[in-house]
Amino acid sequence: MAEDKHGMLRHFLAALAYRTQKALREAPSDFADFEAGNLTRTPRELVQHMTSVLGYARTFFRGGSYRPEPLPSLEGEVERLHEMLADLSAHLAAGDPLVDMTPEQLLQGPFSDAMTHAGQLAMLRRLHGSPVPPEDFIVAEIDRANVGEDQASPRSPDREWPEELP
């Protein structure tokens, strides 16, 4: 995989880590098991699913299969998600070859799927009555070497978009 492609994929994973942490930062304690209705996943289930999707992506580097068992807490699920992000980022940084998948397919499939779920976490925060503060993500401090839980604070909070529910 060319350096520019795997560098961009690592940046995408770092952006995923950032947006996931933004959606979870300062969430109320009962958010983990919030049920929006109509069989939607809870935040804890969403994070588990994100790890599962990314674990599937990892099989194209390592082979095998990946089906994580549910963990009892959102904190445990989040920790496992960031471990998966770190492992994928390490494969990309090392230039490990993908098997039966292109970098573009990795992006359009499991990586984009996981980012969609980060957005769902943010939407669930609003439905829960605790909206995520808006910000201009173009200037967010995203470092492709940082896919951990400790993400930067917003550089440019959007002061013109209402944060409070009507």
Give the ranges of each region predicted by the language model.
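Short, contiguous alpha-helical
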Residues: H6, R10-L24, F31-E69, L98-P166
